[in-house]
UniProtKB/Swiss-Prot annotation:
Protein family according to the UniProt entry: Belongs to the UvrC family.
Positions of region (Disordered): 557-577
Keyword flag DNA repair: yes
InterPro entries according to UniProt: GIY-YIG_endonuc (IPR000305), GIY-YIG_endonuc_sf (IPR035901), GIY-YIG_UvrC_Cho (IPR047296), Hlx-hairpin-Hlx_DNA-bd_motif (IPR003583), RuvA_2-like (IPR010994), UVR_dom (IPR001943), UVR_dom_sf (IPR036876), UvrABC_protein_C (IPR050066)
Protein name: UvrABC system protein C
Length: 746
């Protein structure tokens, strides 16, 4: 049995404390494979030991891989956040949500630890005694801005070796000759004055001193002109023009006192992408993108909370390593309860207040105070789980109040929408980044052909998956198509499985058999000449077999929330079920003509992939055999160990996990699963929406939406008064009384 391995280490429910804490799963070799946190350890951990079919597929894989479980009790949820992140960083568990940066971003670096600070552009953030400003979206824009600013603030940009060589020879570098360096190496400028130039350059680059400094230069220019110092006025004019160009590259989108991080979010069943805009002093000072694979069946609120913990833990650790939260753990035997203590960043908060006071007093940007890693405000498209705890934790990191909220209107809402759009585009790029490469795609198809013993590469691959609720309700299937290893969404199909009695197939194997039978009886299986399959051939081929009906429902082009094309194999939304008697005046129901136009199934695939192991493969092979299809290869990809199964073979084929062929099969399988579960949830949602409101006369769909949006549920409506109903737009007194009476009669 697949679930037996969990019984080897399943703790007694009474032994698990009903307290907040963090837990670790380990595999047979003692490696940590997953770290999680919970408000109530007992409730959370017992969920992992429920029947496997109730768990998310990847959670199934995780618990079947695990061989031990341990947990740590903490005092508060805030401590669990810190400890969970510490363990994730320490152990790098394979099943944990890890937000990956899709590229390295450029930063403006200032070597604050040197007596003569240096300014340069870098993509690494590992040097000690160095402050980093950014990230910036485009390196060429950063270099261009720095080049312009060096004419106004001629600071050192050379490496340590070049600087020491100039000191020994007494000859500065070329930048000093063209006015882009003040040559501190040969004492043309004092160290304190050079440091002040660095502070001013950083202040302009970060948006703190851009406009104020330009205003000061403008006043100086006018004074010089009034005193007839025209050469000085001309130099100041040129500096102002250069600074204006740099400042305009970072448009002011808010008031200058606005410091905020604005996040956008996009996700599907398998992956999520996040995009962030960094707003400092009213200007967009940078942007960044992360992507993550969904490991557990967690919602967007939990994903957003995990993102904020990871992003700001990294930022705070990079900028304040000396005052990062200290965690001491007393680790005992596996399965025992443990305690932790955490210290907050009081010293860092005091230092932040002192820097802010000093900057307000002097009017200068403090070189030792880079862009705050934690802003005053965080704008998110989805309110994160444990928002209040996160705000408290971020307040400690920042040394000042931090607010997390969802923008609903105004400029911040518009910027959040832009971030959402960027996240959506990044999600699509991430999904196709490897498979879209021609070389990788060719290698992937060749790997699959070699592993399965095919004569040629499978140019067209179809994959099938079954999705249903416990008990077989809302049973559906999906068919996804990959041509040249690229998803062809216009060929996607989805099937509503009905069965002989209209109640669905008896199990997943029967559902898979029905789906494939239906697909290939609608496809070009009677020969390329396009002849029909009559009723006698159909009955003969299906005699004694599982011949329940499958209605193949397709997606109209531009008519679904996934943006996927598709068409209807029958032209009416459903195929004609086998065995349904039509009117005698209509065409015989059991005759299926070969169709070649785009509204029907296309040509046969080279390879059929099913989501599952040997039983699923045998069911698929049987369906193809009964349909007279003998030139299409079949294989299955089992989730647990990613084994490839083929018909009539007692042992699986093992493909290297890092091979392009394995990646292609996984991509096809996961896409089919996503497509199936999306349709299943859509069907389930439609069924759940049929509520008590359907029985009330005069309350149509539009009124139902208004009522549900206002009250949230039918249960809340039953607790409402007539006056409460009248507050809903369009509901008068008479209709409110009818609603009240109808809901209380039921």
């Amino acid at each position: 049995m697949l679930g037996d391995s969990r019984d080897l280490f399943r703790p007694k429910t009474s032994d698990i404390p009903a307290k907040p804490g963090v837990y670790k799963w380990r595999d047979g070799e003692g490696r940590v494979i997953y770290v999680g946190k919970a408000k109530n350890l007992r409730n959370r951990l017992t969920n992992y030991f429920q029947p496997l079919y109730l768990l998310h597929p990847r959670t199934q894989t995780m618990v079947l891989t695990a061989r031990s479980l341990e947990w740590t009790v903490v005092a508060t949820e805030l401590e669990s956040l810190t400890l969970e992140y510490t363990w994730i960083k320490e152990f790098d568990p394979r099943f944990n949500v890890q937000f990956r940066d899709d590229k390295t971003y450029p930063y403006l670096a200032v070597s604050t630890g040197e007596r003569i600070p240096r300014v340069w552009v870098t993509r690494s953030r590992k040097r000690r005694d160095t402050r980093y400003f950014g990230p910036y979206a485009k390196v060429w824009e950063l270099r261009h801005s720095l080049d312009r600013l060096l004419r106004t603030f001629p600071v050192r940009t050379c490496t340590t070796n070049v600087f020491h060589k100039a000191q020994l020879t007494g000859r500065p570098c070329l930048f000093a000759s063209i006015g882009k360096c003040s040559a501190p190496c040969v004492n043309r400028i004092e160290a304190d004055e050079h440091r002040r130039l660095c502070e001013q350059l950083v202040g302009v680059m970060t948006g703190r001193l851009g406009r104020p400094y330009i205003a000061q230069l403008t006043r100086d220019m006018k004074e010089a002109s009034a005193e007839l110092e025209f050469e000085k006025a001309a130099r100041l004019r040129d500096q102002i023009q250069m600074l204006e160009t740099v400042v305009q590259q970072n448009a002011v989108v808010f008031d200058q006192d606005v410091d905020a991080d604005v996040f956008g979010f996009a996700s599907d069943e398998l992956e999520a992408s996040v995009h962030a805009f960094y707003v400092r002093a009213g200007s967009i000072r940078g942007e960044r993108n992360w992507s993550v694979e969904r490991v557990e069946d967690i919602d967007d609120a939990d994903l957003m909370a995990d993102l904020l913990v990871q992003v700001y833990s990294d930022a705070a650790g990079d900028n304040h390593p000396q005052s990062a939260a200290t965690i001491s753990t007393n680790r005992e035997a596996i399965g025992s309860t443990q305690t932790i203590t955490a210290t907050d960043a009081v010293a860092r908060a005091q230092a932040t207040r002192e820097r802010n006071t000093r900057q307000e007093t002097t009017g200068r940007a403090d070189l030792l105070a880079p862009i705050a890693p934690v802003p005053r405000e965080i704008i998110v498209p989805v309110e994160p789980a444990r928002r209040e705890e996160l705000e408290g934790w971020l307040t400690n990191l920042r040394g000042g109040a931090v607010t997390i909220r969802v923008a609903s209107r105004g400029d911040k809402k518009q910027l959040m929408d832009r971030a959402n759009e960027n996240a959506s585009q990044a999600l699509q790029r991430s999904k196709m980044s490897r498979i879209s490469d021609m070389g990788a795609r060719t290698q992937a198809m060749n790997d699959v052909a070699k592993a399965l013993g095919l004569a040629e590469a499978p140019l067209r691959i179809e994959c099938y998956d079954i999705s249903n609720t416990v008990g077989g309700a809302f049973q559906v299937a999906s068919m996804v198509v990959f041509e040249d290893a690229i998803a062809k969404k216009s060929e996607y199909r989805r099937f509503a499985i009905r069965g002989k009695d209209g109640k669905g197939a008896v199990d997943d194997l029967s559902a898979l058999y029905e789906t494939l039978t239906r697909r290939f009886k609608h496809g070009n299986i009677a020969g390329d000449s396009g002849e029909s399959i009559d009723a006698e051939q159909r009955v003969a081929s299906a005699a004694g077999k599982m011949t329940t009906a499958v209605a193949a429902e397709t997606i109209a082009a531009n008519g679904n929330d996934n943006g996927e094309g598709g068409s209807d194999i029958s032209g009416k939304g459903h195929a004609v079920p086998v065995g349904v008697q039509n009117d005698a005046r209509e065409s015989p129901p059991d005759i299926v003509q070969q169709n070649t136009n785009r509204h029907h199934f296309a040509y046969k695939p080279n390879l059929v992939v099913v989501d599952g192991g040997k039983p699923q493969v045998m069911a698929a092979a049987k369906a193809l055999e009964d349909c007279g299809v003998n030139d299409v290869a079949v294989c299955g990809l089992a989730k647990r160990l990613e084994e490839v199964w083929v018909p009539d073979d007692d042992y699986p084929i093992i493909l290297k996990r890092q091979s392009e062929g394995m990646y292609l099969l996984q991509r096809v399988r996961d896409e089919s699963h996503r497509f199936a579960i999306t349709y299943h949830r859509q069907q389930r949602r439609k069924g759940a929406l049929r509520s008590a409101l359907d029985e009330i006369p005069g309350i149509g769909e539009s009124y139902q939406k208004r009522l549900l949006n206002h009250f949230g549920s039918v249960k809340a409506m039953r607790e409402a008064s007539v006056e409460d109903f009248e507050k809903v737009k369009g509901i008068g007194h008479a209709k409110a009384e009818a609603l009240y009476n109808a809901l209380h009669e039921q």
